Design a protein with these regions (language model features):
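Glycine-rich, aromatic-flanked loop segments that form ligand/cofactor-binding clefts
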Residues: 66, 101-108, 139-186, 223
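Polysaccharide-binding and catalytic clefts of secreted carbohydrate-active enzymes
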Residues: 85, 150, 180-305, 315-318
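Aromatic- and acidic-residue-enriched segments that line the glycan-binding/catalytic groove
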Residues: 116-127, 162-189, 227-245, 370-373
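Substrate-binding cleft of secreted/luminal carbohydrate-active enzymes
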Residues: 304-326, 349-424
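Active-site-adjacent "subsite" loops/lids of carbohydrate-active enzymes
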Residues: 62-64, 68-70, 74-79, 161-212
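Aromatic-lined substrate-binding rim segments of carbohydrate-active enzymes
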Residues: 110-158, 252-261
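Catalytic domains of carbohydrate-active enzymes, especially glycoside hydrolases
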Residues: 88-113
Length: 425
């Protein structure tokens, strides 16, 4: 990318930031326009509950309001031509804007492949049905154009290690999939295939992929999800651990993951210091530390030249009063968010919260009596937003787009959208 093009993107990012800050105090003309547009609620005709949340008089300044757009959403989009994909992308961005969101997190590397032109990874099978096949246009470029035209930021969501989640996803791997070109970098877990976090060359390749994205596209940031070590099985990296001379497997694995995340962060900042790099870990801090091997204390507290992330967005997909079969309420929404907020954190590191829109009408599986009913009010997500704002959280993200706009629970989803729109207006 030329310096001239980089400068143009930098100026455009400043413009978007000013636009988004403006959303914090009042509804822009563009947002008003989109709110007046009808949003299809799906084919089900059940009446929607009336949202109980009153409009918020003033949005928190700088609040991050995001939605995850996963490979599941892309699987339902029309890639038959650039025009068809652009129409779907435009509708998606319109819907995001109508909710008062300001950030779209688009999963552009779900299986060691790419929804963009890459010299490192094959085209995603989501584009044509065949991994490695060029769709004839650049989906990420289209997404960026449509997002930025509406003042929305777009962060490129990268799954760093996963190449395959099962024998059929993706159905057939391209010849230049890393599973084929570098099988020595890969570990298999059940039917899945993952880059081995203990192999430095594999981590370096992931970082090169991050650099390629931020150098070639006007993304507003890079976003990693919670897929780090795929298993606690000591056999997957036994040879590397033995060669390391270290005594503590858990600590060594945390170092491996942190080395990758730190390098990805630094690659983003080297391309443009104004870009953001964030990670969405599991909501259970114990699982993060001891199963995913994420060193939360380091990630949250490191700053300056030692910074590892710009933000963390733990996935808090439990409702109020969520109760385990043991009787523990540690993971109840009100308790686990307070636990995260109490963790030591550098002033420069933001803390956001991922929330489970997919729980709407279904529930969270808790042992508490209202584990389903509280997700059937039409204002479950808005209630959480209100409480997060009161607690001082910096923002939130919704998993996932389809749960609000393509849900089988169309009546409830419509009510949840209305409640969120009222809060974000």
């Amino acid at each position: 990318m030329t310096q001239r093009r980089r400068n143009r993107h930098r100026k455009r990012r400043v413009g978007r930031r000013a636009f988004l800050i403006g959303l914090g105090g009042s509804v822009s003309a563009a947002l008003t326009y989109y709110l007046l547009r009808s949003i299809p609620a799906g084919n089900n005709a059940e009446p929607a509950p009336s949202p109980q949340t009153a409009p918020n008089p003033a949005l928190p300044s700088g609040e991050w309001r995001a939605v995850w757009v996963s490979y599941l959403e892309f699987a339902e989009m029309d890639f038959s031509s650039e025009a068809a994909f652009r129409a779907d992308a435009a509708a998606l961005m319109d819907n995001c804007l109508s909710l008062g969101l300001n950030t779209v997190i688009a999963q552009v590397r779900p299986f060691g492949d790419a929804l963009y032109r890459s010299s490192l990874f094959p085209w995603s099978h989501l584009c044509t049905g065949v991994q490695g096949q060029d769709p004839g246009f650049d989906p990420l470029d289209v997404l960026l154009t449509e997002a930025h035209a509406r003042g929305l930021s777009l962060e490129a969501w990268v799954n760093p290690y996963r190449l395959r989640s099962s024998a059929s996803m993706p159905p057939v791997l391209a010849e230049n999939s890393l599973l084929n070109t570098h099988p020595e970098w890969v570990c298999t877990v059940n039917e899945g295939a993952y880059l081995n976090p203990a192999i430095p060359e594999a981590a370096d390749y992931v970082v090169q992929g991050v650099a390629e994205l931020v150098q070639n596209y006007a993304v507003d940031g890079i976003h990693f999800d919670d897929y780090f070590y795929p298993t606690t099985d000591p056999s997957i990296d036994a040879a590397q651990f033995a060669a390391s001379g270290e005594a503590d497997l858990t600590a060594w694995r945390r170092t491996n993951v942190t080395r990758l995340v730190k390098a990805a962060h630094d690659a983003v900042k080297a391309a443009d210091p104004t870009l953001r790099f964030g990670v969405s870990p599991q909501g259970n801090p114990d699982n993060d530390r001891n199963e995913q091997y994420t060193d939360l204390s380091v990630w949250l507290t490191a700053s300056g030249a030692d910074a590892v992330v710009d933000y963390l967005c733990p996935q808090i997909y439990w409702g109020y009063g969520y109760t385990l079969s043991s009787g523990s309420t540690r993971f109840a929404f009100e308790n686990i968010t307070a636990e995260w907020l109490a963790l030591p954190r550098a002033e420069s590191t933001a803390l956001y919260f991922g929330r489970g829109a997919y729980r709407i009408g279904v529930g969270d599986g808790g042992a508490n009596a209202d584990s389903v009913s509280q997700w059937c009010t039409g204002s479950a997500l808005a209630r959480q937003v209100t409480d997060l704002r009161s607690a001082g959280a910096g923002g939130w993200a919704l998993y996932r787009y389809g749960s609000l706009f393509r849900s089988d629970e169309s009546g409830l989803a419509a009510a949840e959208r209305a409640a969120l729109t009222a809060l974000n207006g």
